[in-house]
A protein has these predicted regions:
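Class I SAM-dependent transferase core
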Residues: 24-76, 81-82
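Conserved class I S-adenosyl-L-methionine
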Residues: 181-206
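A short acidic, Gly/Pro-enriched loop at the edge of an enzyme's catalytic core
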Residues: 141-150
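Helix-to-beta-strand junctions that scaffold the AdoMet/dcAdoMet cofactor pocket
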Residues: 101-102, 160-161, 174-176
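Core SAM-dependent methyltransferase catalytic element
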Residues: 212, 218-233
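A short glycine-rich, Lys/Arg-flanked "PGG" loop and its adjoining helix->strand segment in the class I
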Residues: 164-179
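A short SAM/SAH-binding and catalytic strip from SAM-dependent methyltransferases
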Residues: 149-163
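Class I SAM-dependent methyltransferase SAM/SAH-binding core
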Residues: 84, 88-140
Length: 233
């Protein structure tokens, strides 16, 4: 028993150190009532849009407001690609991407079981055979390492309860040289009619993704309301 004691103490020390790092990374304090009172790198994390927001995700005005067609053109999808739609929700983007990947596939990743159930029904009804629904956790995508050519996150990253851990998981799932496209409403533009907590600045996004090991490539600044930020592994 005496010989085990140093190892037990070492394990306890390492566990406490890791816990302390997690506590230091996130700050708990009040702020915008539409947030979760948890802050990361000076940014308050927003509340998650639940499955009750499906009608808003599928609204007819979305193409006009966000120019989804241009967003998809920016992606330059090639047949055979493996794309992950992170925070896929109702499958609005996944359904469109599934028609662009040819023999490839689209991982439609979401943390809500209700969204995954909705996606499964949509796949069945619309015969979207290239879509693979994936239920993630708050800290892990549940995707294989080095399996994805491109990731797309549209208006969802700012809601992640554990943005650092999720960014690490995204980095791991991307193939070497793979791209991550982050689309977020521009906080720099007061004319964008979205609540402040559901916006992000370019500088904030770059700071957070660089902290997880991503390289910033470019901002394709051609969407009406949103940043289109490209990061690489």
């Amino acid at each position: 028993m005496q010989t085990l004691k140093p190892y037990i103490l070492l394990f306890a020390f390492l566990s406490l150190s890791l816990f302390s790092l997690g506590q230091d990374r996130y700050k708990l304090r009040t702020g915008d009532p539409n947030g979760i009172n948890k802050w990361y790198m000076g940014r308050q994390i927003a509340q998650v849009m639940s499955h009750y927001g499906i009608d808003w995700l599928e609204r007819e005005e979305r193409e006009m407001e966000e120019n989804t067609s241009l967003l998809l053109k920016n992606l330059a999808v090639k047949p055979g690609m493996v794309i992950a739609d992170i925070g896929a929700g109702s499958g609005y983007h996944s359904a469109l991407l599934s028609k662009m990947v040819g023999t490839g596939k689209v991982f439609a990743v979401d943390v809500e079981p209700e969204m995954i159930a909705y996606l499964n029904e949509r796949i069945k009804q619309e015969k979207l055979s290239r879509i693979v629904p994936v239920l993630s956790t708050e800290q892990n995508l549940s995707l294989p390492e080095n399996s994805v050519d491109m990731m797309l996150l549209v208006d969802v990253y700012h809601e992640f309860s554990y943005p650092y851990e999720m960014a690490l998981s995204m980095l791991a799932a991307l193939k070497p040289g793979g791209k991550l496209v982050l689309v977020e409403f521009r906080s720099e533009d007061s004319a964008v009619p979205i609540k402040t907590i559901h916006k992000m600045s370019e500088a904030q996004a770059i700071k957070e993704f660089k902290a997880a090991g991503f390289r910033f490539d470019k901002n394709i600044d051609n969407l009406p309301w949103q940043h289109y930020l490209v990061f690489t592994k």
